């Protein structure tokens, strides 16, 4: 058996992509080795290919050297699903970052797109504006700057009620078969040739004609079922969750267990819409609103985002810089800002200085005036539960009539119709909240042990959606942040733990409570290295990756080659 030579592998990789795109030292690999919220480990190298052919060649080199490959696009995941975790791998680990492969190809007059591995949702949204269409997800990813393929591979949900999880049955990907051989699978529905070199080069250069694009009515480029599923408000199961076997297909839900080169996706017609802001001190009000709007409008609501007052307050203070940055510079620049902050943090940590940038940003924003509209602030003070609702204009009159009549009878809440600025800021505030718990932790290290972040899908008929924790658990928590995609009954629940409490123990206690409620988790952030993959999901991973060469160990599965079983 040939002896493994790290230097020989690195030299081969450098010959493929160039020396500057093979990173090996701890500081330059830091932003690729660490998750945004969770996960970290050692790597042999981070490789950043510049073409699809280079991506294929890097993959060949990695498999030839018997390395584990972790595919990574934007690294905005929240469960460590695109970074290494721990140091107990049985083979060297390579991270392949696809951030340079940003190609987006518009086909069928904008009704569909083909996205390469590094394409971002923000860029796709900008391109589709010229066609008066939208991607599956608009600004609404927990970490702005998320990639299109990351969403598909982790069947991410998002805020848009009608669209469900990111999903396609049309993809171009590579997998390692049970004999350990690398294969390229072209299920993109585009005739591109026969050899990997020809297929990948022609795709990247868009060297195909309209006649080469195949339209098979049996193959979907989006989830056609969800708009029906979400309206079934009396069903005793969640509308969507990561381990749903009916939404796992090749690249969709693959979580890096294959190497994806491109996906083909439907786009969506842009519609004129209006935003309502709803506040209440009775959770039953929001339940009644959800059930009515999902079943009685001319068209499904576009979005319905829930914010608990405690999450509102933490987000207002500790998500302020994110909010203001996006307001000033737009979403396209957020990844650059994160990368710059990460480099500064990495440099300072060499001198044992941790969290300085967070403290500085908090100090700056503390002295800036309030960034949220006056009417939202008034509702913050009056109401515990908040719902930001967007409906198509053909449903606006009926929605307003219902809310007016409802709150005439139920004095526990109220609503207002947002101006364009209020609506935009309300949704942006909701998304800034998602990172606020991290900022709170990083600026209160002496008080905070860590964060337990849960991503849950409740049953569609569950009326008891406000969590009641046992007193024994409550006393270990400094703050609870509840927010989420209310009409989908998907909630994000961040618990900021007091110093001295074990986050893992607390998380496992939370899981037992969720099991008792027959909730599914994770709902849309995928298992990463945080959650346990349920049998259907673990079996899907093993089928895709029989040698266990890709993204090893996710979902608490085996980190061993061939899944720890004898080679068949």
Task: Label every PLM stretch briefly.
Residues 129-287:
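FAD-binding subdomain of flavoenzyme oxidoreductases
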């Amino acid at each position: 058996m040939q002896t493994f030579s790290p230097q020989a592998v690195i030299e081969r990789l450098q010959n493929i992509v160039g020396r500057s795109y093979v990173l090996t030292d701890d500081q330059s690999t830091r932003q690729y080795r660490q998750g945004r919220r969770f996960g970290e480990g050692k790597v042999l190298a981070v490789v950043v290919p510049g073409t699809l052919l280079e991506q294929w060649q890097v993959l060949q080199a990695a498999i030839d050297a018997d390395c584990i490959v972790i595919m990574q696009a934007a690294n905005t995941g929240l469960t460590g699903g695109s970074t290494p975790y721990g140091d107990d791998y049985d083979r060297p680990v390579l991270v392949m970052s696809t951030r340079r492969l940003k190609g987006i190809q518009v086909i069928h007059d904008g009704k569909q797109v083909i996205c390469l591995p590094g394409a971002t949702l923000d860029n796709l949204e900008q391109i589709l504006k010229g066609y008066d269409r939208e991607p599956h997800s608009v600004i609404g990813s927990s970490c702005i700057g998320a990639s299109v393929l990351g969403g598909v591979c982790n069947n991410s949900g998002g805020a848009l009620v009608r669209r469900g999880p990111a999903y396609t049955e049309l993809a171009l990907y590579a997998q390692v078969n049970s004999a350990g051989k690398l294969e390229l699978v072209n299920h993109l529905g585009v005739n591109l040739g026969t050899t990997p070199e020809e297929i990948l080069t022609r795709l990247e250069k868009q060297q195909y004609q309209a006649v080469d694009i195949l339209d098979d009515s049996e193959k979907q480029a989006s989830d056609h079922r969800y708009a029906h599923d979400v309206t079934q408000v009396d069903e005793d199961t969640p509308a969507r969750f990561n381990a749903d076997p009916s939404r796992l297909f090749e690249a969709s839900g693959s979580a890096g267990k294959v190497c994806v080169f491109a996906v083909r996706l439907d786009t969506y017609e842009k519609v004129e819409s209006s935003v309502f802001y709803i506040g209440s001190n009775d959770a039953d009000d929001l339940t009644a609103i959800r059930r009515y709007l999902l079943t009685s409008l001319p068209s499904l609501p576009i979005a319905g985002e829930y914010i608990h007052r405690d999450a509102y307050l933490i987000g207002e203070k500790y998500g302020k810089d994110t909010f203001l940055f996006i307001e000033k510079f737009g979403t396209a620049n957020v990844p650059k800002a994160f990368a710059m902050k990460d480099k500064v943090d990495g440099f300072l940590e060499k001198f044992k200085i941790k969290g300085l940038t967070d403290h500085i940003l908090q100090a700056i924003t503390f002295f800036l005036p309030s960034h949220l509209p006056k009417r939202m602030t008034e509702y913050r003070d009056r109401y515990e539960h908040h719902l930001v609702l967007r409906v198509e204009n053909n449903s606006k009159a009926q929605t307003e009539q219902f809310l007016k009549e409802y709150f005439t009878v139920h004095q526990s809440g109220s609503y207002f119709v947002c101006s364009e600025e209020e609506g935009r800021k309300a949704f942006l505030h909701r998304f800034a909240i998602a990172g606020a718990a991290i900022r709170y932790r990083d600026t209160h290290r002496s008080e905070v042990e860590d964060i337990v972040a849960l991503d849950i899908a409740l049953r569609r008929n569950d009326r008891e959606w406000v969590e009641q924790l046992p007193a024994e658990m409550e006393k270990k928590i400094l703050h609870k942040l509840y927010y989420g995609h209310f009409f989908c009954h998907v909630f994000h629940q961040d618990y900021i733990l007091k110093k001295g409490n074990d986050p893992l123990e607390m998380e496992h206690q939370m899981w037992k409570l969720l099991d008792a409620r027959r909730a599914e988790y994770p709902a849309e952030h995928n298992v990463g290295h945080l959650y346990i993959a349920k049998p259907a999901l673990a079996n899907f991973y093993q089928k895709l990756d029989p040698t266990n060469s890709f993204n090893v160990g996710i979902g608490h599965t085996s980190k061993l080659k061939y899944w720890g079983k004898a080679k068949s």
